[in-house]
UniProtKB/Swiss-Prot annotation:
Organism this protein belongs to: Bacillus licheniformis (strain ATCC 14580 / DSM 13 / JCM 2505 / CCUG 7422 / NBRC 12200 / NCIMB 9375 / NCTC 10341 / NRRL NRS-1264 / Gibson 46)
Name of this protein: Serine hydroxymethyltransferase
Gene Ontology molecular function, alphabetical: glycine hydroxymethyltransferase activity; pyridoxal phosphate binding
Subunit structure: Homodimer.
Superkingdom to which the source organism belongs: Bacteria
Family: Belongs to the SHMT family.
Plays an important role in substrate specificity (site feature) positions: H225
Species classification: Bacteria, Bacillati, Bacillota, Bacilli, Bacillales
Its biological purpose: Catalyzes the reversible interconversion of serine and glycine with tetrahydrofolate (THF) serving as the one-carbon carrier. This reaction serves as the major source of one-carbon groups required for the biosynthesis of purines, thymidylate, methionine, and other important biomolecules. Also exhibits THF-independent aldolase activity toward beta-hydroxyamino acids, producing glycine and aldehydes, via a retro-aldol mechanism.
């Protein structure tokens, strides 16, 4: 960085500190990843200066001919990756992508079927503290109490009983493969639309390692970060018949000017996702998650549903006698970043929880292999089982430092 250190020392210092944190800690938050330096360069470009309300070729401002190119590239690449008929890359976030779909097909008070937040759903899938739960009549489905897999019969029974206008599939903390075909079949029985929120698994879908929801859903929403490894933002994929309505719901419906520098960064990351190297990366993400799950189970730690099919593992801490809040703090102390997370049928409050969610997208981007991820699992077990033993926690800290030194991050940056 050439100008920021001299112009604004306080902000530069915060950026430096965050850079050091990312280097010195092991990032296991399942919704985070490390983008390429090319993505960061696009996002930090002169495109940040350009207002571009509207869509390519139909803008409300002049001088958009070059940002139009960037947006067209992003849309075309996303179509190619996922086989979608129409793509909107303007949503600022996954939540706004979901909002746009709701505003497109729902009226206030309409019935929607969505996954219970504590069972792995998302705030925007009907939580009473979110606009979705306030605006619409959400009926919740969840996972089977024994298997902790989605109970598709429960989904069907509730659909038949409540006749929802929309069924939402997808999750923020569900470690198993979702059967989108089954959701489509249930929706067809009751004449409902299907929206799939694939925010967490989009990168795995892009690599052909998770079933693609596009053939089964009327609408697919996603973030562009997480496993897709792009900038923070959202995206909507839909059938051509809904294209104009979706575009109107985004602009002028719920957003004004799109963030053209972010859209350019999305385009760069989509280009990366089309390469063979990305498929290898995504396979390694899954391999690492499975190995992490196996390691934790060998250490006697319980996992929701017994394991994982994707990039994340949901840990049930009750047998260890600690809460998710305590575990998050203990692991942060030794240099491992996770988030506390509710587990199905959780007796604890949402800010306390009985679980933690861990994911392998970021550490895999950093280069962690199976041997390294086994060591991560062993360190987690050591810290959680000995969370009040300062000597053991110091040992865990040193082992984390050895790993982070072995896998440096962003060596080309000058700050």
């Amino acid at each position: 960085m050439k100008h920021l250190p001299a112009q604004d020392e306080q902000v530069f210092s915060a950026i430096q500190d965050e850079r050091k944190r990312q280097q010195s800690k092991i990032e296991l938050i399942a919704s985070e990843n490390f983008v390429s330096e090319a993505v960061m360069e696009a996002q930090g470009s002169v495109l940040t200066n350009k207002y571009a309300e509207g869509y390519p070729g139909k803008r409300y401002y002049g001088g958009c001919e070059h940002v139009d190119v960037a947006e067209d590239i992003a849309r075309d690449r996303a179509k190619q990756i996922f086989g979608a008929e129409h793509v909107n890359v303007q949503p600022h976030s996954g939540a706004q992508a979901n909002m746009a779909v709701y505003f497109t097909i729902l009226e206030h008070g309409d019935t929607v079927l969505g996954m219970n937040l504590a069972h792995g759903g998302h705030l925007t899938h009907g939580s009473p503290v979110n606009f979705s739960g306030v605006q619409y009549n959400f009926v919740e489905y969840g996972v089977d109490k024994e298997t902790q897999y989605i109970d598709y019969e429960d989904v069907r029974e509730k659909a038949l009983k409540h006749k929802p206008k929309l069924i939402v599939a997808g999750a923020s903390a569900y470690p198993r493969t979702i059967d989108f075909k089954k959701f489509r079949e249930i929706a067809d029985e009751v004449g409902a639309y299907v929206m799939v929120d694939m925010a967490h698994i989009a990168g795995l879908v892009a690599a052909g390692l998770h079933p693609n929801p596009v053939p089964y859903a009327d609408f697919v929403t996603t973030t562009t970060h997480k496993t897709l490894r792009g900038p923070r933002g959202g995206m909507i994929l839909c059938r051509e018949e809904f294209a104009k309505q979706i575009d109107k719901s985004i602009f002028p419906g719920i957003q004004g000017g799109p963030l053209m520098h972010v859209i350019a960064a999305k385009a760069v990351s989509f280009g990366e996702a089309l390469k063979d190297e990305f498929k290898t990366y995504a396979q390694n993400v899954i391999n690492n998650a499975k190995r992490l799950a196996e390691t934790l189970k060998k250490e006697g730690i319980e996992l929701v549903s017994g394991g994982t099919d994707n990039h994340l593992v949901l840990v049930d801490l009750r047998s260890l006698g600690i809460t998710g809040k305590v575990a998050e703090n203990v692991l942060d102390e030794v240099g491992i970043t996770v988030n506390k997370n509710a587990i199905p049928y959780d007796p604890e409050k949402p800010f306390v929880t009985s679980g933690i969610r861990v994911g392998t997208a970021a550490v895999t981007s950093r280069g962690f292999d199976l041997e390294a991820i086994e060591e991560v699992g062993a360190i987690i077990a050591l810290a959680l089982k000995n969370h009040e033993d300062e000597a053991k926690l110091e040992e865990a800290k040193q082992r984390v430092e050895a790993l982070t030194n072995r896998f440096p991050l962003y060596t080309g940056l000058d700050y």
